[in-house]
Amino acid sequence: VLYHYEYTTSLTFATDDPAKAAWQASVPELAHSHDFLVNCVLSVASLHLGRLHEDKIQKTNMNAVAASRMNKALTTYRPQLGNINASNAAALFASSTLTAVYLFRTSAIDIETLRETIPYGTIIPPAGVVDKMMSCILRTVWGLRGPLTVLMSGWNHVINGAMHPVAARKWWPSRRIPATLRAEEEDQRLRNIDSLWMDTNKAWDPQTRHLNDALAHLREAYALVSQLTLTGVFPSMTAVPYAVDDTTVGILTDRGAIFVWSTLISREFIHLLETKDRDALVILAYYAVLPGRVRNVWWLEGLGADFVTAIAMAIGIENWHLIEWPAQVVGVDLWNAFGVRQDRLMGKPDELHMDVI
């Protein structure tokens, strides 16, 4: 499993060579001194092997190993978050990021398991199933708070340590503006979302500030992604195929850009998501487009479609028109969400610029 991590799994976490080197060489080195990181590495590598196995029993076994290792990691990892220092910051940052990857992948697995319990052709599943689907989605949102916690408390230690290439993004543009005509059109779509609350009697509600902030951060995330898919502007890297406009596949220079939003939204906004606030869930559905457009990354497979499907079930048929565009982009037919899925999780033949490892 460790061999698989070093030569295969580690290369799927980053798009640039310095960061790949950190995952491939520095993380195993850090793991020598931190058992929790060893278990995180074994967990995610097992999960990756489970993804690659065709045999269902082997797949189930590897996923069980992954869960066991992650549970062991968390028992020793969590207590150390209260004392982040020079000796453990890099290992904690690596562990928290691997935990996020674990949560992304297991959320997709758990939702697939739930889908198998839903009769073919169901339009809206029972409320209990919808709650479980939303719980899976929110797990991924919370997942990225782990790396954020480490960075906020131990930034100087991380930025000066072995994980510096993973944490630092000095070359990102400081001014986030839509970089193409298509990006400007999508920004207009995002801008229009605030009419759901600003043009109603909810405009003065306390929660409005959190909705506005989350939407503003999402507009910046879309703009950043549009800037990082421009050709020949930013550092040349082993980048990831990204469906820029749902038909043309560009190259996203750094997929880390799609995760920024989850680290910026407030806890109050996350609480709105947990209480199934319609307007917050619409914003989340538009966010789902970003991971939904990434191609050929095993731990992001299906995530965009899962987000939109769960959100659609939570907000009800009467509100489906509000998420029609995100559903179309990620390939989800809302009226046939539990039939044969039509989304292009693995990309079309001409999109396979990078093998699915």
Task: Annotate each predicted stretch with a short phrase.
Residues 29, 132-357:
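C-terminal effector modules of eukaryotic transcription factors
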Residues 1-82, 311, 348-357:
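Amphipathic alpha-helical dimerization/protein-protein interaction segment
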Residues 21, 25-32, 57-64, 82, ...:
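Short, solvent-exposed segments of well-ordered alpha helices
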Residues 36-37, 87-95, 281:
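Alpha-helical scaffolds flanking conserved acidic
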Residues 61-78, 104-158:
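Structured all-alpha helical bundle cores of eukaryotic regulatory proteins
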Residues 4, 72, 94, 98-102, ...:
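Alpha-helical scaffold segments in carbohydrate-active enzymes
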Residues 44-48, 95-109:
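Short glycine-rich beta-strand segments
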